Amino acid sequence: MLPAANRMRRSDEFARTFRRGTRRGTRRLVVHAATTDAGEPPRVGFVVSKAVGGAVVRNRVKRRLRAVLMHRVTDLLPGTLVVVRALPPSANATSAELERDVDGSLTSLGLRAKVVPAR
């Protein structure tokens, strides 16, 4: 599970990330990112709509995305807000595919403080 300090919960943080941030997308997800004060820890949020599937499918996608970001939150630059928005094809994606999509999007957005070698 993501540490409480790294979880995005307030709607104004989500709105700020969508409005002022940049985004990179793949077939399965879109990663939105914005920056805040450098003194704050990086925070991550997830959006998985009903278009992805029923409750069981949505929760499975959220669990997989949380697991991927849990290991990458320490690599993010301080003060970064990241929202991962799952698209309908993410329902049939494997964890490895979601991991590859998240890694590619974070790298292309330039959000990593240190580079992690590919597996």
From Swiss-Prot:
GO terms for cellular component: ribonuclease P complex. InterPro entries: Ribosomal_Su5_D2-typ_SF, Ribsml_uS5_D2-typ_fold_subgr, RNase_P, RNase_P_CS. Its EC number is 3.1.26.5. Keywords: Endonuclease, Hydrolase, Nuclease, RNA-binding, tRNA processing. The keyword Nuclease applies. It catalyses: Endonucleolytic cleavage of RNA, removing 5'-extranucleotides from tRNA precursor. GO terms for biological process: tRNA 5'-leader removal. It is an enzyme of class 3 (hydrolase). The keyword Nuclease applies. GO terms for molecular function: 3'-tRNA processing endoribonuclease activity; ribonuclease P activity; tRNA binding. Consists of a catalytic RNA component (M1 or rnpB) and a protein subunit. RNaseP catalyzes the removal of the 5'-leader sequence from pre-tRNA to produce the mature 5'-terminus. It can also cleave other RNA substrates such as 4.5S RNA. The protein component plays an auxiliary but essential role in vivo by binding to the 5'-leader sequence and broadening the substrate specificity of the ribozyme. Belongs to the RnpA family. This is Ribonuclease P protein component. It comes from Beutenbergia cavernae (strain ATCC BAA-8 / DSM 12333 / CCUG 43141 / JCM 11478 / NBRC 16432 / NCIMB 13614 / HKI 0122). The gene is rnpA.
